[in-house]
Amino acid sequence: MENISIALPKGRMADSAITLFEKAGIAENILKDISRKLVVNDHKNLMKFMLVKPMDVPTYVEHGAADLGICGKDILLEQKKDCYEVLDLKFGFCKMVVAGPKEAKDSFLTNKRVATKFPNIAEEFFRQKGENVEIIKLNGSVELAPIVGLSEVIVDIVETGNTLRENGLIVIEEIFPSSARLIVNKASLKTKSQRIKEIIIKLKEVVETFKEV
């Protein structure tokens, strides 16, 4: 039986991802210490789980360091890594939006500046709208950008909208909804086909019983 490695996301989706695998009967009671250890081996079932930054999950999967991984649809669309997206896991719901001060919604700027952690998504969105924008790539809290005059608007992921409201910003336009997805390394799906398909089936059975973990 082949070893299977799985990359799980740190942060807001970690608990839901772990719960999903436990409900599916995969690595029961194995994952409780993963936030401390980062890598957990299930020697009995020949499985290895690793906890990585959500943005890094597709890279681990694309390069074969992980056979499977969980990350948001937003990350997949931004990075366009060479791996298979096989299942919508129905948790980690959020939206990619254009947001800014209320006055930004009521005005039209031909050369507006857009601050974002998702430059590829932002560029493609405004290109399709025929709008000429300057994309400013940030790694931290993008909500600050319009407040201090770095940009007119932002493109970012919104879950509850509380952070926007707290900073005097509103959603101007929704780009797409996002949720957690299961991704698979292309080579692994060929060489470890039976084991990976068994895992996918078990996870799918759990996903079909609920709307959100």
Curated annotation (Swiss-Prot):
Localization: Cytoplasm
PROSITE patterns: ATP_P_PHORIBOSYLTR
Record keywords, A-Z: Amino-acid biosynthesis, ATP-binding, Cytoplasm, Glycosyltransferase, Histidine biosynthesis, Nucleotide-binding, Transferase
Catalysed reaction equations from the record: 1-(5-phospho-beta-D-ribosyl)-ATP + diphosphate = 5-phospho-alpha-D-ribose 1-diphosphate + ATP
Known EC number: 2.4.2.17
Gene Ontology cellular component list: cytoplasm
UniProt enzyme class: transferase
Pathway entry: Amino-acid biosynthesis; L-histidine biosynthesis; L-histidine from 5-phospho-alpha-D-ribose 1-diphosphate: step 1/9
Record-level GO BP terms: L-histidine biosynthetic process
GO molecular function: ATP binding; ATP phosphoribosyltransferase activity
Family matches, as CDD domains: PBP2_HisGs
Function, in words: Catalyzes the condensation of ATP and 5-phosphoribose 1-diphosphate to form N'-(5'-phosphoribosyl)-ATP (PR-ATP). Has a crucial role in the pathway because the rate of histidine biosynthesis seems to be controlled primarily by regulation of HisG enzymatic activity.
Family indicated by similarity: Belongs to the ATP phosphoribosyltransferase family. Short subfamily.
Recorded domain comment: Lacks the C-terminal regulatory region which is replaced by HisZ.
Subunit structure, interactors included: Heteromultimer composed of HisG and HisZ subunits.
Name of the molecule in the record: ATP phosphoribosyltransferase
Organism: Thermoanaerobacter pseudethanolicus (strain ATCC 33223 / 39E)
Phylogenetic classification of the source organism: Bacteria, Bacillati, Bacillota, Clostridia, Thermoanaerobacterales
Gene name, Swiss-Prot/TrEMBL: hisG
